């Protein structure tokens, strides 16, 4: 009878460890996409800043937009897919909604169709480049059924719409500042989500 109590306690501790691992994975489900797309937005802003100081040609900026976001989107989904796989292997919580396999395959399959059949999306994106990461965050949120990511996608989409009108008004530095603020906001959100994740539980040894 005495030997059964430590065994039962060890079982409960194991269940608690599994629960904590799943909570950590859920937090990373939020923090990883915000980190990836926040970094991509900031990199895009830096590229635009370098172009603005190097040339006054609007065609150069448009060329960057045509190339950057399709490639950056591919890098983003591949990075998230690899991250989710590493979390599943390390914490043993499985892929579940954190798996980006279908999203990655769908992105690469649909990208040529978008280029050929929905070219106006790219043209519109020239005037509101934040709409591209907003759409990708929305796709991730839909895949994971995650409310926080849906709110983040909506906020980025609103920023993209504002950027569209700022571009139409020919205010050169305002869209760049908006992208920097948006990217920084996503990174801050990622850091907050990561800090809220429980620390890795220590291994427990049953007393026999």
Report residues per predicted region.
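Selected alpha-helical membrane-embedding segments in polytopic membrane proteins
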Residues: 27-112
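Hydrophobic core of alpha-helical transmembrane segments in multi-pass integral membrane proteins
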Residues: 69-83, 106-119, 159-161, 180-195
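N-terminal juxtamembrane cytosolic/stromal segments of multi-pass membrane proteins
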Residues: 1-30
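Terminal transmembrane helical module of multi-pass membrane proteins
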Residues: 135-208
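Membrane-proximal helix-loop-helix units in multi-pass membrane proteins
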Residues: 98-99, 103-158
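Intrinsically disordered, low-complexity segments enriched in small/polar residues
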Residues: 7, 90, 123-126
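Membrane interfacial helix motifs at helix-loop boundaries and amphipathic/re-entrant anchors
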Residues: 46-68, 116-130, 161-180
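Helical transmembrane-bundle signal
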Residues: 41-48, 73-76, 111, 133-137, ...
């Amino acid at each position: 009878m005495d030997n059964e109590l430590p065994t039962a306690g060890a079982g409960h501790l194991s269940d608690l460890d599994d629960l904590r691992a799943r909570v950590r994975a859920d937090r990373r489900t939020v923090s990883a996409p915000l980190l990836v797309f926040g970094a991509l937005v900031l990199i895009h802003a830096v590229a635009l800043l370098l172009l603005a100081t190097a040339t006054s040609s609007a065609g150069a900026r448009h060329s960057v937009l045509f190339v950057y976001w399709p490639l950056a989107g591919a890098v983003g989904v591949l990075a998230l897919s690899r991250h989710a796989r590493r979390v599943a292997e390390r914490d043993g919580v499985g892929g579940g909604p954190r798996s980006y396999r279908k999203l990655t395959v769908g992105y690469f399959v649909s990208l040529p169709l978008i280029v050929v059949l929905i070219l106006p999306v790219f043209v519109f994106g020239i005037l509101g480049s934040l709409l591209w990461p907003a759409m990708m965050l929305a796709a991730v949120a839909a895949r994971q059924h995650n409310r926080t990511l849906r709110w983040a996608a909506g906020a980025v989409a609103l920023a993209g719409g504002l950027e569209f009108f700022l571009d139409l008004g020919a205010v050169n530095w305002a869209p760049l500042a908006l992208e920097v603020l948006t990217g920084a906001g996503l990174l801050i959100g990622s850091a907050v989500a990561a800090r809220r994740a429980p620390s890795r539980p220590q291994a427990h040894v049953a007393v026999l």
